C-alpha cells in the first residue's frame, strides 16, 4: 500500500535517456559535423580535391547481435559507409565512390557498448564550460590581483592577468608573457579605440611611446624597472654571448627608470626579458605584429622577424577554426558575460572579445563587478558519451586527413579513392578511446541498480578534467546549484569523494550540456502543478526565488501563509508565499536513484546514507528474490528502465510461454503511421496529422465513435501534463452497472482493468451521452478508436438510430509498465501510467470524466457469472463460460493465423431484456472543434491478421562481475497482455520490482559477544532454506599456443588420465556436467621432446604394452574450492595463430561454470541505511532468541551500531516491516514525509503496529510503555531476557564481498626479490605480512617469540627458512637470523652517503664492523 499520496504528479524522465539521447545525437548530427570540418581535403597546389558527402552516410547492420558479441568476444559495431568524390582539376576528371571509413561501435538499447566481448560504459564527464572566467588571487601582503582565463572548446588557452604593479599581461603556454596593448594592437585595434572602450581609461595614464623603442627592441635591448641589477625573467645564454646593463650604477636605484638598454658582444643570439610595464605600445599594427612575434619567440634573430610571421602566429593560435574553436556555446557564454553581440557562427577569438575582457579586468581592479565561482554549475557542463565518441572520431579523422594529404603530395598518375582512404586511423582512435580511456569503464553489472547508476555517473576526472591528487575541497564540496541536479549524498568514499557524482532523479542534460531540473510556477502563493513544469539550468535560476519541494500545499494548491524557506543564488532565507516564483516538483528532486530507494532517508545521517546508496549497488542477485515489505515506490522504475525485465512491445495473446521463449500473437497494425514528433521530453508536441484534419494546441478535441463501445470508458477533461495516456482500459460489469445506476460514470481508481471478454447490454430506449471535451496538450500519436484490437477484442453494436452510445476515445501510445502486486494496483497503474515516463505519484493526471444518462431507465444488466482476474483469462475457461450467453462468439482459424467473427448466436435467456441487432459495418466519426470532420468506415466482418512476436529469454547469462543474469516468465499461455505489461522477471526482480535482498526478522541486542563491532549473528535457517544462496558464473578460457616443440592441441586423448567420461570427442566438458575440484574441463596436450630411453626402459614399455608418450598433459582443470555445473561451451577461433598452421580440433574455447554459493561466516551483509557487518557465527535456529509467539529470529544486530552512526531510519524500517509482516501488507514510503506534519514517520509506524496488534490479537506487537520493543526469550534456556528488545523486520542485502573470493592459505609461494618477504594478495598467492599495528598488537600481548618468528623465519630470514626444518628434525635449537629487510634498510641508508654500519663486540671487548651481507 502507498502511505502518502503525492500532491503533484510529474513524469520521471527515462533513467537511461542521457546515454541514449547523446549517442543518437552523435549519429544524427555529430558525425556529420566532424566530417564536414575536414571537408574538402586538397593537396598543396589545390589540383587534387577529396570531398566527403557526410549527410548521405550509411551504417551496415551489425554482423552479430549484442548477446553473440559477448559470447564470441567481439565488438558490437557496424561499418560506416560514406560517398567520396575525388576531383583532379588538372586532368578535369572526377571519381565518385562509396568507401568504408571504419567500424563504429554501437550503443545497445540499454545504453552501453560491447567492446571485445565486455560491456563497457562511457561515463559523463563534467568539465569547465568554454568561455571566460575571472578570478582573484590573494597575496601575502593582503593585496588582491585579478586574472581572466579564456577557455576554448578546442585549442590553446589564454590568460590575461593584472599584476601587483597594475600592469596587464597576456600569457600563453610555452611562451613568455607579453603586454596586453601589443596583443590588442596586433589584432587591429588602434590606441584611441582601446582607450574609448574602457570604463577607466586613466588605468593607462602612464602610457608612453618614443621613437627609440622599436630601435632598441630590434637591437636586442629590453626595458626593466627592477631595482635589482638582475633581469626578471632572464635566460641562460651560451658562452659567447654576454650582456651588460648600461649606466646601471647610476640609474638602477632610481624609481623613474623606464628602460635600461643592454649591449651585447655578439649578434649570434638575442635576449628579451619581461617588459616592466605592460603599457608599452606600438604606433602601427605592423609594429605590433612584429613585436608580438619577437616577444613570443625570444631566441629568434630580430633580423628574421617580420610582421607576417606575427600575423601567421596569431592565425595559427587563435584565428584558425580548425585548430581553435570556442564552440557555439563558448561564443554564447562570451556574449552573455561581456554583453557582446558577436554572431554565434564566429567561434574564434575577436579583438572585441579581448578588449572587453581587458575592460572587465580593469573594472575589477577598481572594485566594480565580481569574480566567477568555478564550482557553480552554470560554469560547468557535461560531456556526454556521444560527445566524447564524437571528439575521438574527430581525432581519427584528423589522422586520416594527414595520411590523405601525404598521399596526395605524391604525384601519382593513377590515384584511386580506395588507395587514399584507410580504415586504420579511425578504427585505431576509437579502439584507443574505448579500450584505454579512463572515461570508458568496465560496466558494473552486479545488479540492475549498479548498472543504471553507472550510466548516470558524472566524473570530474579524465582528460580535460581535474587531477584527483591536486583537487581541493572546493571542487569536492556541495554547491547550492547542485540542488536538483547532482546528488549531494551518492559519491564514492576515498580519494574520489566529490569528484565522481550521480545525476538526480528528475535532472536532464540540455543540448548545451548543462544540467536542468524542473520547477512548478507559483502565482500569488498557488502552485500551478496542472501545467507543464519548467526546466531551469543553474544560470536560468539565478534571479528566481525557489522553494523546496517538501512544503505542503492544500487541496486548492495554496502554500501555507507562514514564512517559508527559499533559496536565491547561494543564500537560504525565508519569505512569504506571494514572493515565491517557483517550487520544486518533488521532495525527491535533490537525490539520486540509489539514494531514493532508501526508506525513511530523512532520519539517516548523510554519511551513512552515502554508504547505503553505494552498498545497494554491491548487492548480489539471489536465487530466490524477495521484494521489500517497506519500499519507496521507485523499485519498479529502476527495474523497468534498466532493461533487464522483459516487457511486451505490443498487445496480444500469449500462445507459448517457457523458460526459453515467450510467443505473443498480436494483430497487424493497419492504422496510419504515427506522425514524427519533435524531440525532447518536455518540448511542446502537437498533432502533426489526424484523421480528416489537424488540431492546434489551443483547440479542443472531441472524438466520438458513435454506435460502438470498444471497451473504452475513460479519458481526460484536463490538459495532459506530460504526455499522452497509457493502455486503453475497459470497465468491468460491476463498476459499469453501479456507475450507470448512479447516472454518472467516473474514471480514476474506480475503473477496473480491461477484460476483453465482458459484454453488457442496455435497453433500446436508453441513450448515453457525453458533453466532455478534451483540450489537447501534447499528443504522441494519431487519434484512433480501439476497434477490433487483438484476439479477444470485439466491437458490440448497441443501437442503430438515436439509441447510440457515444464514446470518449482515449488516445495515445501505451507505456511500458513493469509489474503489479495485486489486481487493485494493476487497475490503478493501468489507468495512471504515462508513456515513456510512468507517473511517480499516485495522483493520476487523468481527471474524472462525466458520463450522464439521457434516459436513466435501465431495466437489466447482464452480470457474467464466471470468475475473472485482472487482464488475464485462459481461452478454455472463456469458451466454457460463454455457453448459453446471448453474446457473440468467435473461433480461431489456425491456418494463416486469422480470426473470423461469425454472426450472433442467439439463445433464449429469460434474465435478459431485448438487445440490439448486430451490424457488420460501422462508422467511427472524429469531430474536431474547428468543425472539420472525417468519416472512416471500418468493416468488422473482415478477418484480422495476427502476427507472432517471439521474445527470447536469457538463461544463466554471465555478467561482468560473474553474477548470473536470467529471466523467469510470469505470463502463462492463454493470457492477454497489453503493451508494456511484464512478461518475464529478472534474477533481481519480483513482479517487476527491484528485489536485491530478503526481509529478515531481527533484533537489536548483544548476544555473547558475537555481534561485537558490527559483527552479525544469523540463523541456520538462512543457510538451509537457501535464503541467501547466489549463483555465480565463472568463465574459463583456453587457447592453443605454439611451443618450442610444436603446436598444442585440444583433445580427449590425454596421457595417464582415467576420468574422461564427461568430455566430448574434442576433449571439452559437456554442458550439464557436474564438475568438482581437479576435474578436467578442457583437455589439452603439448608436444614434448623425444626421450632417449635405454634398452631396459624400452623393454619395460614393450612388456607393459604402453606407448612411449610424446605429449604432456596441460589440461585446464577445475580450480581449488570450486564445484559446479558446466552450462555453456563456446568454441572460437584463435586470433594470434599464423594462417599457415594446420591443426585438428578447436583453437580457442570458452567454458562457463555455474556455482552455488551459500552464505558463510565471513560474508559481508548490509541494510539500506549504511548498517554493514561481517557474519561472525551461524546459530542453529533452536538456539536463536524467539518472539512471544514462538517465532525464532533470523538475525541479531548490535544496538550500539545505531546511536553513534545516527542512521535511525533502520529502526523505522524494521518496525514498519514488522507491522507489514503481521498485517500482510507492503508499504511504499516516500522519503521526506515531514511535509505532512511533524513526527509523521513515528505516527505511521506506531499506528500500523497498533493496527497489527488489534488484528492479530498479539498484544506484544505494540506496548505504549515501550513502543517498538518486546520481550524476547533465549532459545537455549527458554528464559526471558531481562530488558525489552527492539524487534523488527528489515531488508538485508548480501554484498559481493564474499569470503569465498577472499579466503586464502599459503604454505610455499613467491617472495619479493628485494625484501624477500612474501608477496601481497590472493591473486599473487601471497602470504602473511606484519605491519606496524600488527607488531604493536603482539608486543601488547607480550608474545615475543611469536613476534620474532613472524618477523624472521616466517618472513624474510633467508638462511633461517632453510635451517628451521633441519633444526626441528634434529631437535636443535632454532638459530636467530637477520631479516632481509634490515639489510635492505642499511644498504639504502649507505646509498644516501650516510655512514651507517653494523658493529659487533668481540671477546676482547673491541668493536668490529660487520659486513651487512654476511650477517647471520
Swiss-Prot record:
It is found in: Plastid, Chloroplast. PROSITE patterns: RNA_POL_BETA (PS01166). GO terms for molecular function: DNA binding; DNA-directed RNA polymerase activity; ribonucleoside binding. The keyword Cell inner membrane does not apply. Keywords: Chloroplast, DNA-directed RNA polymerase, Nucleotidyltransferase, Plastid, Transcription, Transferase. The keyword Transferase applies. It is an enzyme of class 2 (transferase). Belongs to the RNA polymerase beta chain family. This is DNA-directed RNA polymerase subunit beta. It comes from Oltmannsiellopsis viridis. The lineage of its organism: Eukaryota, Viridiplantae, Chlorophyta, Ulvophyceae, Oltmannsiellopsidales. The gene is rpoB.
Amino acid at each position: 500500500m502507498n502511505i502518502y499520496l503525492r500532491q503533484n504528479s510529474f513524469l520521471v524522465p527515462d533513467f537511461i535517456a542521457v546515454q541514449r539521447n547523446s549517442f543518437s545525437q552523435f549519429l544524427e548530427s555529430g558525425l556529420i559535423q566532424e566530417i564536414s570540418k575536414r571537408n574538402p581535403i586538397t593537396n598543396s597546389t589545390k589540383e587534387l580535391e577529396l570531398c566527403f558527402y557526410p549527410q548521405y552516410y550509411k551504417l551496415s547492420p551489425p554482423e552479430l547481435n549484442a548477446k553473440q558479441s559477448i559470447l564470441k568476444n567481439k565488438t558490437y559495431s557496424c561499418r560506416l559507409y560514406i560517398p567520396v568524390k575525388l576531383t583532379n582539376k588538372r586532368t578535369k576528371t572526377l571519381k565518385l565512390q562509396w568507401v568504408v571509413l571504419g567500424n563504429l561501435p554501437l550503443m545497445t538499447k540499454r545504453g552501453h557498448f560491447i567492446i571485445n566481448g565486455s560491456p563497457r560504459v562511457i561515463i559523463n564527464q563534467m568539465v569547465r564550460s568554454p568561455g571566460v572566467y575571472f578570478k582573484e588571487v590573494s597575496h601575502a601582503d593582503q593585496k588582491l590581483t585579478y586574472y581572466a582565463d579564456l577557455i576554448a572548446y578546442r585549442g590553446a588557452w589564454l590568460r590575461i592577468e593584472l599584476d601587483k604593479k597594475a600592469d596587464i599581461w597576456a600569457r600563453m603556454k610555452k611562451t613568455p608573457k607579453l603586454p596586453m596593448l601589443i596583443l590588442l594592437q596586433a589584432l587591429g585595434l588602434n590606441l584611441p579605440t582601446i582607450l574609448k572602450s574602457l570604463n577607466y581609461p586613466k588605468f593607462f595614464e602612464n602610457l608612453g611611446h618614443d621613437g627609440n623603442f622599436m630601435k632598441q627592441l630590434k637591437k636586442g635591448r629590453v626595458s626593466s624597472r627592477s631595482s635589482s641589477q638582475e633581469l626578471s625573467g632572464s635566460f641562460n645564454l651560451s658562452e659567447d654571448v654576454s650582456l651588460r646593463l648600461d649606466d646601471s650604477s647610476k640609474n638602477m636605484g632610481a624609481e623613474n627608470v623606464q628602460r635600461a638598454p643592454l649591449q651585447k658582444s655578439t649578434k649570434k643570439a638575442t635576449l628579451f626579458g619581461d617588459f616592466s610595464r605592460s603599457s608599452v605600445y606600438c604606433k602601427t599594427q605592423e609594429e605590433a605584429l612584429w613585436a608580438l612575434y619577437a616577444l613570443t619567440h625570444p631566441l629568434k634573430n630580430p633580423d628574421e622577424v617580420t610582421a607576417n610571421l606575427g600575423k601567421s602566429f596569431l592565425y595559427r593560435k587563435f584565428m584558425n577554426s580548425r585548430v581553435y574553436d570556442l564552440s557555439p556555446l563558448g561564443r554564447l557564454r562570451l556574449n552573455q558575460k561581456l554583453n557582446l553581440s558577436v554572431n554565434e557562427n564566429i567561434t574564434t577569438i575577436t579583438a572585441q572579445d579581448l578588449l572587453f575582457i581587458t575592460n572587465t579586468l580593469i573594472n575589477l581592479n577598481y572594485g566594480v563587478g565580481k569574480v566567477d565561482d568555478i564550482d557553480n554549475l552554470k560554469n560547468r557542463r557535461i560531456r556526454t558519451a556521444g560527445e566524447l565518441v564524437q571528439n575521438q572520431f574527430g581525432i581519427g579523422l584528423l589522422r586520416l586527413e594527414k595520411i590523405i594529404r601525404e598521399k596526395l603530395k605524391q604525384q601519382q598518375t593513377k590515384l584511386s579513392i580506395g588507395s587514399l582512404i584507410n580504415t586504420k586511423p579511425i578504427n585505431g582512435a576509437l579502439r584507443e578511446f574505448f579500450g584505454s580511456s579512463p572515461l570508458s569503464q568496465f560496466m558494473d553489472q552486479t545488479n540492475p541498480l549498479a548498472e543504471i547508476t553507472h550510466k548516470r555517473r558524472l566524473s570530474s576526472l579524465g582528460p580535460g578534467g581535474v587531477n584527483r591528487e591536486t583537487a581541493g575541497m572546493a571542487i569536492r564540496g556541495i554547491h547550492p546549484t547542485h540542488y536538483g541536479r547532482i546528488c549531494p549524498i551518492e559519491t564514492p568514499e576515498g580519494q574520489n569523494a566529490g569528484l565522481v557524482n550521480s545525476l538526480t532523479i528528475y535532472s536532464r542534460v540540455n543540448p548545451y550540456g548543462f544540467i536542468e531540473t524542473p520547477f512548478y510556477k507559483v502565482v500569488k502563493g498557488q502552485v500551478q502543478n496542472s501545467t507543464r513544469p519548467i526546466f531551469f539550468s543553474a544560470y536560468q535560476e539565478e534571479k528566481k526565488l525557489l522553494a523546496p519541494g517538501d512544503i505542503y500545499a492544500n487541496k486548492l494548491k495554496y502554500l501555507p501563509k507562514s514564512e517559508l524557506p527559499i533559496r536565491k543564488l547561494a543564500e537560504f532565507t525565508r519569505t512569504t508565499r506571494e514572493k515565491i516564483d517557483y517550487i520544486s516538483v518533488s521532495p525527491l528532486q535533490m537525490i539520486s536513484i540509489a539514494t531514493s530507494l532508501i526508506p525513511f532517508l530523512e532520519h539517516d545521517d548523510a554519511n551513512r546514507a552515502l554508504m547505503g546508496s553505494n552498498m545497494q549497488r554491491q548487492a548480489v542477485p539471489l536465487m530466490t528474490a524477495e521484494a521489500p515489505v517497506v519500499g519507496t515506490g521507485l523499485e519498479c522504475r529502476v527495474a523497468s528502465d534498466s532493461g533487464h525485465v522483459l516487457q511486451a512491445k505490443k498487445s496480444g495473446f500469449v500462445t507459448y510461454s517457457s523458460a526459453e521463449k515467450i510467443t505473443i500473437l498480436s494483430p497487424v497494425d493497419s492504422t496510419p503511421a504515427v506522425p514524427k514528433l519533435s524531440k525532447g521530453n518536455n518540448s511542446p508536441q502537437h498533432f502533426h496529422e489526424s484523421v480528416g484534419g489537424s488540431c492546434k494546441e489551443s483547440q479542443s478535441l472531441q472524438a466520438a465513435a458513435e454506435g460502438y463501445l470498444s471497451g473504452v470508458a475513460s479519458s481526460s477533461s484536463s490538459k495532459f501534463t506530460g504526455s499522452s495516456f497509457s493502455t486503453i482500459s475497459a470497465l468491468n460489469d460491476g463498476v459499469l452497472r453501479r456507475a450507470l445506476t448512479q447516472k454518472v460514470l467516473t474514471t480514476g481508481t474506480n475503473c477496473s482493468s480491461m477484460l476483453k471478454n465482458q459484454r453488457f447490454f442496455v435497453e433500446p430506449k436508453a441513450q448515453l451521452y457525453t458533453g466532455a471535451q478534451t483540450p489537447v496538450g501534447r499528443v504522441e500519436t494519431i487519434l484512433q478508436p480501439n476497434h477490433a484490437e487483438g484476439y479477444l477484442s470485439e466491437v458490440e453494436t448497441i443501437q442503430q438510430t438515436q439509441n447510440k452510445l457515444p464514446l470518449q476515445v482515449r488516445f495515445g501510445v501505451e507505456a511500458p509498465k513493469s509489474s503489479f502486486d495485486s489486481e487493485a494496483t494493476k487497475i490503478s497503474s493501468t489507468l495512471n501510467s504515462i508513456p515513456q515516463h510512468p507517473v511517480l505519484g499516485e495522483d493520476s493526471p487523468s481527471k474524472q470524466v462525466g458520463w450522464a444518462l439521457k434516459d436513466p431507465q435501465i431495466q437489466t444488466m447482464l452480470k457474467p457469472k464466471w470468475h475473472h482476474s485482472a487482464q488475464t483469462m485462459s481461452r478454455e475457461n472463456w469458451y466454457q463460460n460463454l455457453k448459453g450467453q446471448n453474446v457473440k462468439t468467435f473461433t480461431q482459424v489456425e491456418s494463416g493465423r486469422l480470426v473470423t467473427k461469425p454472426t450472433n448466436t442467439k439463445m433464449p435467456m429469460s434474465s435478459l431484456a431485448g438487445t440490439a441487432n448486430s451490424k457488420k459495418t460501422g462508422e467511427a466519426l472524429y469531430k474536431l472543434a474547428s468543425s472539420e470532420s472525417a468519416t472512416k468506415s471500418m468493416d468488422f466482418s473482415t478477418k484480422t491478421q495476427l502476427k507472432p512476436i517471439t521474445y527470447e529469454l536469457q538463461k544463466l547469462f554471465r555478467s561482468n562481475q560473474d553474477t548470473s543474469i536470467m529471466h523467469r516468465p510470469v505470463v502463462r499461455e492463454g493470457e492477454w497482455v497489453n503493451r508494456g505489461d511484464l512478461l518475464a522477471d529478472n534474477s533481481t526482480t519480483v513482479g517487476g520490482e527491484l528485489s536485491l535482498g530478503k526481509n529478515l526478522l531481527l533484533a537489536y541486542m548483544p548476544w555473547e559477544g558475537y555481534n561485537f563491532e558490527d559483527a552479525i549473528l544469523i540463523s541456520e535457517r538462512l543457510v538451509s532454506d537457501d535464503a541467501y544462496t547466489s549463483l555465480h558464473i565463472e568463465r574459463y578460457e583456453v587457447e592453443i599456443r605454439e611451443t618450442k616443440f610444436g603446436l598444442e592441441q585440444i583433445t580427449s586423448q590425454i596421457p595417464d588420465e582415467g576420468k574422461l567420461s564427461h568430455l566430448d570427442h574434442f576433449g571439452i566438458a559437456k554442458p550439464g556436467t557436474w564438475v568438482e575440484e581437479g576435474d578436467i574441463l578442457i583437455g589439452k596436450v603439448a608436444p614434448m621432446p623425444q626421450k632417449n630411453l635405454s634398452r631396459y626402459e624400452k623393454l619395460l614399455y614393450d612388456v607393459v604394452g604402453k606407448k612411449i608418450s610424446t605429449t604432456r598433459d596441460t589440461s585446464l582443470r577445475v580450480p581449488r574450492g570450486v564445484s559446479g555445473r558446466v552450462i555453456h561451451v563456446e568454441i572460437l577461433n584463435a586470433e594470434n595463430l599464423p594462417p599457415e598452421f594446420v591443426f585438428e580440433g578447436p583453437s580457442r574455447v570458452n567454458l562457463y561454470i555455474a556455482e552455488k554459493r551459500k552464505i558463510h561466516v565471513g560474508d559481508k551483509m548490509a541494510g539500506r541505511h549504511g548498517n554493514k557487518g561481517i557474519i561472525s557465527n551461524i546459530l542453529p535456529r533452536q538456539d536463536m532468541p524467539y518472539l512471544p509467539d514462538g517465532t525464532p529470529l533470523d538475525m541479531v544486530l548490535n544496538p550500539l551500531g545505531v546511536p553513534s552512526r545516527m542512521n535511525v531510519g533502520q529502526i523505522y524500517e524494521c518496525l514498519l516491516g514488522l507491522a507489514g509482516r503481521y498485517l500482510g501488507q507492503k508499504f511504499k514510503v516516500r522519503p521526506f514525509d515531514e511535509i505532512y506534519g511533524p513526527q509523521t514517520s513515528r505516527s505511521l509506524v506506531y499506528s500500523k503496529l497498533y493496527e497489527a496488534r488489534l488484528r492479530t490479537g498479539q498484544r506484544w506487537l505494540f506496548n505504549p510503555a515501550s513502543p517498538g520493543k518486546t520481550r524476547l526469550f533465549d532459545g537455549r534456556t527458554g528464559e526471558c531476557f531481562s530488558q525489552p528488545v527492539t524487534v523488527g523486520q528489515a531488508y538485508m542485502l548480501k554484498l559481493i564481498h564474499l569470503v569465498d573470493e577472499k579466503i586464502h592459505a599459503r604454505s610455499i609461494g613467491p617472495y619479493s626479490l628485494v625484501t624477500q618477504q612474501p608477496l601481497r594478495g590472493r591473486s599473487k598467492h601471497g602470504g602473511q605480512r606484519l605491519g606496524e599495528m600488527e607488531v604493536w598488537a603482539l608486543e601488547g600481548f607480550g608474545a615475543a617469540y611469536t613476534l620474532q618468528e613472524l618477523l624472521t623465519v616466517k618472513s624474510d630470514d633467508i638462511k633461517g627458512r632453510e635451517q628451521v626444518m633441519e633444526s626441528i628434525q634434529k631437535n636443535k635449537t632454532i638459530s636467530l637470523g637477520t631479516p632481509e629487510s634490515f639489510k635492505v634498510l642499511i644498504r639504502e641508508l649507505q646509498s644516501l652517503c650516510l655512514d651507517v654500519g653494523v658493529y659487533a663486540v668481540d671477546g676482547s671487548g673491541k668493536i668490529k664492523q660487520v659486513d651487512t651481507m654476511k650477517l647471520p
